[in-house]
């Protein structure tokens, strides 16, 4: 007795195999291929994933930062960034130099502007002034802050024993020098007396000898 199901023909069995192969191929497709396939069928683009959106936002932010116009900064044809500022006292432009990035040139302009106008200056990065105004911007030539000069530290105190020893050495040296001085004075005085003729004269001695001989003859 037959169950009522008709046996499949070879053609139908081959068709089922082809359908299974197509399903396997579809399952192995990547998400991007599926999205492209669906967009082609529907005619509407499918929104990209969150990662693609974040990457596109970062690229857009970078392009916006590159296109930002900083005060006192302009780009050279060869790619460098030049910074300059107008001196309010001389009504002339002051050249600040060329820099690799626009941000470095903008910081150089901010520094010069702060030196010229103080807190009234219009800056590219005013938040840097609020964070640390004394370290980043004022230069020593234009800063009005008071300069505190610390006096030199006093020498360490000397112990009384060391003072007494030093005083004793000083006294011994002074006594030796005074003794040497007195000896020199005595030697010089004796030599001067000898030169002045205080020694017995040889001629006087000869005269005395002659007188004594004459008296004996008488």
Swiss-Prot record:
Residues 69-126 bind DNA. Keywords: Activator, DNA-binding, Ethylene signaling pathway, Nucleus, Transcription, Transcription regulation. GO terms for molecular function: DNA binding; DNA-binding transcription factor activity. Residues 44-56, 174-194 have a biased composition (Low complexity). It is found in: Nucleus. Probably acts as a transcriptional activator. Binds to the GCC-box pathogenesis-related promoter element. May be involved in the regulation of gene expression by stress factors and by components of stress signal transduction pathways. This is Ethylene-responsive transcription factor ERF112. It comes from Arabidopsis thaliana (Mouse-ear cress). The lineage of its organism: Eukaryota, Viridiplantae, Streptophyta, Embryophyta, Tracheophyta. The gene is ERF112.
């Amino acid at each position: 007795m037959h169950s009522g199901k008709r046996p499949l023909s070879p053609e139908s069995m081959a068709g089922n195999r082809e359908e299974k192969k197509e399903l396997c191929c579809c399952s192995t497709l990547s998400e991007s291929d599926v999205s492209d396939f669906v967009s082609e069928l529907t005619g509407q683009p499918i929104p990209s994933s969150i990662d693609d959106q974040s990457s596109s936002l970062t690229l857009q932010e970078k392009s916006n930062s590159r296109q930002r116009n900083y005060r006192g900064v302009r780009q050279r044809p060869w790619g460098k960034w030049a910074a300059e500022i107008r001196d309010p006292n001389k009504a002339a432009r002051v050249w600040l130099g060329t820099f690799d990035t626009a941000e470095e040139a903008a910081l150089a302009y901010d520094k010069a502007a702060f030196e010229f106008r103080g807190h009234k200056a219009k800056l590219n990065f005013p938040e840097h002034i609020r964070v640390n105004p004394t370290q980043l911007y004022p230069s020593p030539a234009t800063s009005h802050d008071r300069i505190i000069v610390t006096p030199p530290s006093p020498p360490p105190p000397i112990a009384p024993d060391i003072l007494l020893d030093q005083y004793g050495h000083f006294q011994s040296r002074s006594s030796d020098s005074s003794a040497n001085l007195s000896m020199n004075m005595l030697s010089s005085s004796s030599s001067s007396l000898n030169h002045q003729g205080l020694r017995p004269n040889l001629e006087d001695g000869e005269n005395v000898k002659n007188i004594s001989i004459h008296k004996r003859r008488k």
